[in-house]
């Protein structure tokens, strides 16, 4: 039982590569693949992203002000991220424990905020340091996931002591936050430089925990 959460976005199509300028519906592919594999499409969260930052980073034609002045029929909105959530119905023999939220730690005001279909307050710069994992050919597409987004997913959909699985671990952001939220973690990653950085990040969390406990005892 339980859930899987997939972070994704639409993909840009370019004239040089695809013969046209537009967007490709990657989230739709993710939904169809999960449903075909027996998962239930459960929820979609839209993650707001600053279109000015996107324009400065990508120089996308549809976001340029000069394009608006020239021909606004080719202007478009910025591209948000999405978290797609899928639920697997458990069998009688393998039903997962429910995840119950304590009202003292998860008040109704917080739920009203997190139940919003658009999360406007995710800090896009709240990510693990990735400089050690960068290679020249990767710099354009390396995009670690925001830690506050990961924390919300872990707190919403798992209990303390549960195991969080990340089959595409990258530099270990999900694992870092899983440990910080008192969960266990299993991750896999094909790229060796990313894997080594993930190990460093997870060890850094362990060191941080050890030294934090030590200093609290001394204090």
Language-model features: locations:
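Core catalytic lobe of class I
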Residues: 1-197, 201-204, 219
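Generic C-terminal helix-cap and adjacent flexible tail
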Residues: 204-211
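Acidic, low-complexity intrinsically disordered tails
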Residues: 211-219
């Amino acid at each position: 039982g339980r859930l899987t959460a997939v972070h994704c976005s639409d993909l840009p199509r370019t004239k040089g590569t695809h013969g046209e300028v537009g967007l490709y519906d990657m989230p739709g592919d993710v939904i169809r693949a999960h449903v075909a594999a027996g998962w239930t499409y459960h929820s979609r969260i839209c993650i707001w992203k600053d279109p000015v930052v996107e324009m400065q980073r990508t120089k996308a034609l549809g976001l340029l002000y000069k394009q608006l002045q020239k021909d606004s029929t080719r202007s478009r909105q910025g591209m948000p991220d999405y978290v797609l959530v899928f639920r697997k119905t458990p069998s009688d023999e393998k039903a997962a424990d429910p995840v119950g939220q304590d009202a003292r730690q998860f008040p109704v005001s917080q739920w009203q905020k997190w139940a919003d279909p658009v999360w406007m307050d995710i800090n896009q710069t709240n990510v693990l340091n990735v400089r050690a994992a960068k290679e020249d050919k990767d710099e354009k597409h390396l995009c670690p996931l925001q830690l506050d987004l990961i924390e919300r997913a872990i707190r919403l959909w798992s209990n303390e002591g549960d195991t969080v699985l990340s089959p595409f671990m990258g530099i270990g952001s999900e694992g870092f936050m899983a440990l910080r939220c008192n969960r266990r973690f299993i991750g896999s990653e094909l790229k060796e430089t990313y894997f080594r950085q993930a190990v460093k990040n997870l060890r850094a969390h362990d060191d941080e925990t050890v030294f934090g406990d030590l200093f609290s005892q001394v204090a």
